[in-house]
């Protein structure tokens, strides 16, 4: 049975391993694989995404088939998993088992758009507001509000002019639940003025989203609320 209620939508065919935490108002689609992942509120993850040891901010759009790549050591005698006892336990001798390399956490900021089929090297930071074009292979950190694409991914342009980016960084709008307000989302200057005015009028309060531990049990996907 999939987890499908008001705060979360997580299909039954989602692979869930390790510590998976989601804020409310997260939407996942079929055949995603999650291992030690945090996903912030209002983030949408399309089908077939593989997310490994990754923190994802709020209001993100993760395209279908996005993969956070694993880290494979190249300085050892072999790159084969035969040396790790937990993978080939019946073959690896106790005396020769190697430590599996520590996988660095990948950080994806807030309001990030990642296109279909993007591959991201583990341990990178994708800045707030960044856009990654479909099919890109990301091998370096991505600066906030940059638009990147290609193999390997390179900066194509900045998403907004510097003055707009400065205003976006100042208000950090993702800390609010903006769905509660009638905003003109399609005009960046107008919507920023609206949010700035709401701040001046002290009508905005920080959105403290309910967090859930998400896990599988008895062929069901379950979400256990985490106390504040």
Where are these regions (language model features)?
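Catalytic-loop Lys-Pro-X-Asn motif of eukaryotic-like protein kinases
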Residues: 116, 134, 143-144
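C-terminal segments of enzyme domains that contribute to small-molecule binding surfaces
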Residues: 9-12, 17, 81-121, 152-228
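Acidic, glycine-centered active-site loop in nucleotide-sugar glycosyltransferases
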Residues: 144, 149-152
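A generic "structured core" feature
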Residues: 131-133, 137
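Conserved catalytic segment of ABC-fold P-loop ATPases
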Residues: 127-130, 143-145
